[in-house]
Amino acid sequence: MEASVLSPTSWEKRRAWLRQSRNWQTQVLEEEAAAALQDALDPEPSSLDDVFQEGNPINKIEDWLQGCGCRDTEEGLSEESGQSNYSGYSSHGTSFEDDLSLGAEATLLSTNGNLFSRNFLQTPRLCQLLDLGSSLASSSMTGGTNKTSSSISEILDQVQEDAEDILFSLGFGHENHKDTSRIPARFFSNPSQAKGINFQLFLKSQVQRMEMEDPCLMLASRFKQVQTLAVTADAFFCLYSYVSKTPVQKFTPSNMFWNFDPTDVPSIRILAPEPEPYSPRERLRRAISKMCLYTGSRDRLSSSYNNPKKNSLDQIVWEVMDRVKGEKIQQDPEHRQALGEESVPPIQNTNPSTSSLPCVSYPKEETQGDMCHAHALARPGPQYHINSTQVRRQLWVLQDINEKPRSAENESPWERKSKARKNLFQRVPVDKNIKSLNLPTIQQKQNQGQARHELTNL
């Protein structure tokens, strides 16, 4: 091998790095650095190691291998032993920037056969390297002996801890266990025979047990929900009974079977159904009120008898009833004789414009009109007939108008019309034996128009 020549700057950098990392003594470092500089500046190539020269005996190789194990007890295994040893240990700290390969320090041997690298590596230091405690490099040579290890078995015997044991304790080398390894083996050897719960069977058994305990299903003392359901069912069945008008048996138990607080049960007050009206007039009124949404309410209809002013619903009812009654009188002669009817002449040549106006608008002709109208009501006629009650009502209306002729003159036309309408629909007292019937409004207007027309002709 050729001698490697190192520049002085590289040795200075190496010396500075060794001083910082290993804390060597200053004097020893200066002497070693000076010797290294002299060897590096020598133009003659240094002689190679006897071990690597050809023709040397084999005993020198054995001596060199035995000398590799000599180390100081305090410094332990140096990191530079890998560079001087040909066995292949890694070098630490010997190469800083020059990137020396393994065995490069072997070229720095002196000519007298002494290994310069051995003296360089055997320099004592104050602090030791980091004690790994689990590696072969740190634990093989810290046994405190200066004996030379000539065999690999002796070096392995000096190891304090086994690397395989360390790796095994750290978890390496084990097989990956599955999740089933966490389950005890007894669960696999003797599996459970449970198949779950049959909810249908459970509910049936609960119902059967409740029926056996109380046939009437009065279990409110044990199940509070039964009480709530019973009260709710009673409320709905009472409502159904009220609508359908059919009696329904309640579910709520009596006090003798059920000790409950009355305040907990809500008081349900169901009004009795109203009796059906037997009067045809009331039934017709209800039928029209259901069909006509614009008619009055129930309170208004109930107070129609006390109020002299009739509403639109009463007017419709009276008109329909009078028409039906008039048709029956025309078709049944026996009914006509029983009532003692009086004929009314047919209406002919009636002016619609004059018939629509009431007779109140002509105060000067009221006296003559009343007389003519009274004679007209007494005339016999084959086409239209009315009874004595209708004649009395008509005469009462005309008499009421004649009693206040002066007040009618001072009133406005709108007040006269409203008063006339009010008098037309006012109730007339009749005998108890005779059923009261009102004259239709159309017939009254036509009769008044006919009387007025006769007065104008006179």
Swiss-Prot record:
Pfam families listed in its UniProt record: KRAP_IP3R_bind
Ranges annotated as biased composition (Basic and acidic residues): 328-339
Observed phenotype of the null mutant: Mutant mice display defective T-cell development, resulting in notably fewer mature CD4(+) and CD8(+) cells in the thymus. The architecture of the thymus is altered, as characterized by smaller areas of the medulla. Mice also have fewer peripheral T-cells in spleen and display diminished T-cell antigen receptor (TCR)-mediated responses.
GO cellular component: COP9 signalosome; cytoplasm; cytosol; endoplasmic reticulum membrane; TCR signalosome
Residues with the Phosphoserine modification: S312
Modification after translation: May be phosphorylated in response to store-operated Ca(+2) entry.
Gene Ontology BP, a term: positive regulation of T cell receptor signaling pathway
Main subcellular location of this protein, as a coarse class: cytoplasm
Subcellular location: Cytoplasm; Endoplasmic reticulum membrane
InterPro entries reported in the protein's UniProt record: ITPR-bd (IPR029325), TESPA1-like (IPR043444)
Compositionally skewed regions (Polar residues) per UniProt: 346-356, 439-450
Alphabetical keyword list: Cytoplasm, Endoplasmic reticulum, Membrane, Phosphoprotein, Signalosome
GO molecular function: phospholipase binding; signaling receptor binding
Span list, region Disordered: 328-356, 439-458
Primary role: May play a role in the regulation of inositol 1,4,5-trisphosphate receptor-mediated Ca(2+) release and mitochondrial Ca(2+) uptake via the mitochondria-associated endoplasmic reticulum membrane (MAM) compartment. Required for the development and maturation of T-cells, its function being essential for the late stages of thymocyte development. Plays a role in T-cell antigen receptor (TCR)-mediated activation of the ERK and NFAT signaling pathways, possibly by serving as a scaffolding protein that promotes the assembly of the LAT signalosome in thymocytes.
Subunit-level organization: Interacts with PLCG1 and GRB2; the association is increased with prolonged stimulation of the TCR and may facilitate the assembly of the LAT signalosome. Interacts with ITPR1 and ITPR3. Interacts with HSPA9.
Protein name: Protein TESPA1
Encoding gene per record: Tespa1
